[in-house]
Amino acid sequence: MELEAKIQSLTATKHTLFQNLMGIEKESLRVSDDGSISQEPHPKTYGSALTNPQITTDFCEALVELVTPPFDSADKVLEDLGNTEHFVHYHLPDNQRYWPASMPCVVRGEAYIPIAQYGSSNRGKMKTAYRQGLSNRYGSVMQTIAGIHFNYSFSEDFWQAYQELMVPEETGQCFIDNHYIYL
């Protein structure tokens, strides 16, 4: 089937595009009053970085990651993110701030970037070891670059319609895995 015909066929299933889910992951560095990366551990008021699904750490103790659950509208995502941002700012220690830029603040060197610690459980040790490996391979400074990640997932109805149109003989998760990147 030609591309134009495939696109035309998909318009019949456009209602499935309103059933998708989205979320955001937002990273920010905590900095001390002097503008350098915080040497303080992840604030206890944020909950455990290992088990709190919405407030965790990314690479280092100072790189806070806010994670929204998946929602079906951008308004809900932004409302949830705003509420979480309000919470972390309210509970941030008085001697710290959030660095507003994606490029890191003043970093005195690799030794001044405390790798995230997730505790003594097997899962926690694995997460910390993974970050130590990133530090060894790429350097810790590179890992302190903060960003915003937009997550988007298509509904099962969309995938079924798309699969029937594109490759009827390929099914299930295998099809989804093979075709996500093309969209």
Q: Which functions belong to the PLM regions below?
A:
Residues H149:
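Histidine-centered active-site/metal-ligand motif
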